[in-house]
C-alpha cells in the first residue's frame, strides 16, 4: 500500500542520518574505496593486515594492522595497530596503538593499554592510557588504569581508578616550587 511505501521511504532517508549519529562524527563517514568489511556474524580466526580502512561488525580473533581508519562495532581479541580507531558498542581485548585518534564510544569495553596521539573515551577501559596530546574522558567513561597525556579533560560523572599525569606537557612543574612557600609572599 501507499502508506507502507511512505514508511519505507522515511526509513531509507533517515538511515544515513542514523548512521552518522551512531558514529558521532563526520570524519569517519569518509571510508576509502579500499575498505575491508567484516560483517556481523562473521568470525575471522587469524591476523588481518591492510593498507586501507577496515569496518568490523563481526569478530576477529587475531591481531589487526590497518594503515587507515578502523571502525569497530563488533569484537576484537588481539592487538591493534592503526592510524585512527573508532569503537562504538565494541568489545576489544588487546593493546591499542594508533598514530592518530582513538575514540572509545559509549557501550564499548576495552581491556588493554591504549597508546595514541589524541583520544576521546566515553566507554569502559581497563588498562593504561598514554596519549601524546589531548585526551577527553567523557561523563559516561570508566577508566581503570593510569592516564598519561599532554592535556586531560575529565567531564563530570566520569570514573577514574588510577592516576592522571601530564608527562607530555611542556610545563616544568618543579619550577613553581623551587623557592618554597616564601616565594608566594
What are these regions (language model features)?
Residues 71, 75-79, 83, 87-95, ...:
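Alpha-helical adaptor scaffolds
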Amino acid at each position: 500500500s501507499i502508506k507502507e511505501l511512505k514508511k519505507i521511504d522515511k526509513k531509507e532517508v533517515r538511515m544515513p542520518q542514523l548512521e552518522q549519529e551512531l558514529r558521532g562524527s563526520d570524519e569517519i563517514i569518509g571510508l576509502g574505496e579500499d575498505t575491508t568489511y567484516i560483517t556481523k556474524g562473521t568470525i575471522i580466526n587469524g591476523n588481518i593486515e591492510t593498507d586501507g580502512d577496515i569496518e568490523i561488525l563481526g569478530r576477529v580473533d587475531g591481531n589487526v594492522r590497518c594503515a587507515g581508519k578502523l571502525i569497530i562495532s563488533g569484537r576484537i581479541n588481539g592487538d591493534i595497530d592503526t592510524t585512527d580507531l573508532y569503537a562504538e558498542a565494541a568489545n576489544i581485548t588487546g593493546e591499542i596503538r594508533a598514530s592518530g585518534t582513538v575514540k572509545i564510544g559509549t557501550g564499548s569495553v576495552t581491556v588493554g593499554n591504549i597508546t595514541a596521539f589524541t583520544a576521546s573515551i566515553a566507554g569502559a577501559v581497563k588498562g593504561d592510557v598514554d596519549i601524546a596530546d589531548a585526551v577527553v574522558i567523557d561523563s559516561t567513561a570508566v577508566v581503570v588504569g593510569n592516564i598519561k597525556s599532554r592535556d586531560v579533560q575529565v567531564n563530570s560523572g566520569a570514573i577514574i581508578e588510577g592516576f592522571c599525569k601530564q608527562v607530555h606537557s611542556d610545563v616544568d612543574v618543579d619550577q613553581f616550587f623551587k623557592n618554597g612557600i616564601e616565594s608566594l609572599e
